Amino acid sequence: MSANDRPATGQPTATYESAFLKACRREPVPHTPVWFMRQAGRSLPEYLKVREGIPMLESCMRPELVAEITLQPVRRHNVDAAIYFSDIVVPLKAIGIDLDIKPGVGPVVEKPIRTRADLAQLRDLTPEDVSYVTEAIKLLTAELGETPLIGFAGAPFTLASYLVEGGPSKNHEHTKALMYGDPQLWADLLDRLAEITSAFLKVQIEAGASAVQLFDSWVGALAPADYRRSVMPASTKVFQAVESYGVPRIHFGVGTGELLGLMGEAGADVVGVDWRVPLDEAARRVGTGKALQGNLDPAVLFSTTEAVETKTREVLDAAAGLEGHVFNLGHGVPPTTDPDALTRLVEYVHTQTAR
């Protein structure tokens, strides 16, 4: 049973009545809940201290370290949810893909997947492959109490892009070439990745995660017709795989203004919106029955407190008519952000939206 489910007795579990989960369920909230993508990361001096000398992938596999890093922004900023500290390529590493995260570059895959024979590299993910995730989440839920923990994974398209390109890419030429040139191989690749991603999310939910977010970082590179035909079936498969757990499912990608409706249609309960589309317009594109998450421009955090508050007020005003709203940035926290700016932002949103 997940931390979001009501037990058979009808009594809610610790996180069920949290502002974050209520907003995800489009229920009335005491205040607009706030959390930040990449809230556990390089913007925090305490993060830099505990990560010193430890490679990224190794840090994702040490349960006590993962728990500490995940908790840091909750302690410092009073955010309404924690997000599990990991990286989207962790499940790929766990099944034996030869990859590393290079500082200043990102994930680099030694042998890109571009042929049918290459698909053999993608075996099933088992809970034993990521036992450190289960252990870390057990530690976290014991510490977090009533604060929900968000589990996450990379969406099939974004994982495929890393695997096919061999690393980060601006234009995704190899990825699109495979998608257009060999549609059946592409579909089989995404289907395998959907199975791996689903298994990774199930491990997190069964360990105690209260919600999950599917990050499709690169999907904004696609036209809507290509998304619907070549990507959406795999994302839908992931959302359907975890539907029975009853936890909110969040879907986010960057530059996805033209895809918002389809991303909701794929099976998300909450659609994340970047800073380019006002939330009232995003709601029109997504349609009814979905909560929205977002969408302050992260760059404003480098401006004055007054500017941050003005832009935040614009986001809150645009969200005023929404059924459910989780406040977030429109992308991850930039590494050089002043952490005090984030603490002030959380306090401002809580104060301004107190019911």
Swiss-Prot record:
The record marks D87 as: Transition state stabilizer. It catalyses: uroporphyrinogen III + 4 H(+) = coproporphyrinogen III + 4 CO2. It is an enzyme of class 4 (lyase). It is found in: Cytoplasm. Pathway: Porphyrin-containing compound metabolism; protoporphyrin-IX biosynthesis; coproporphyrinogen-III from 5-aminolevulinate: step 4/4. The keyword Lyase applies. Transmembrane segments: none annotated. Its EC number is 4.1.1.37. It comes from the Bacteria. One of its GO terms (molecular function) is uroporphyrinogen decarboxylase activity. Substrate binds at R38, Q39, A40, G41, R42, D87, Y162, S217, H331. PANTHER family: METHYLTETRAHYDROFOLATE:HOMOCYSTEINE METHYLTRANSFERASE RELATED, UROPORPHYRINOGEN DECARBOXYLASE. Belongs to the uroporphyrinogen decarboxylase family. HAMAP family: URO_D. Catalyzes the decarboxylation of four acetate groups of uroporphyrinogen-III to yield coproporphyrinogen-III. This is Uroporphyrinogen decarboxylase.
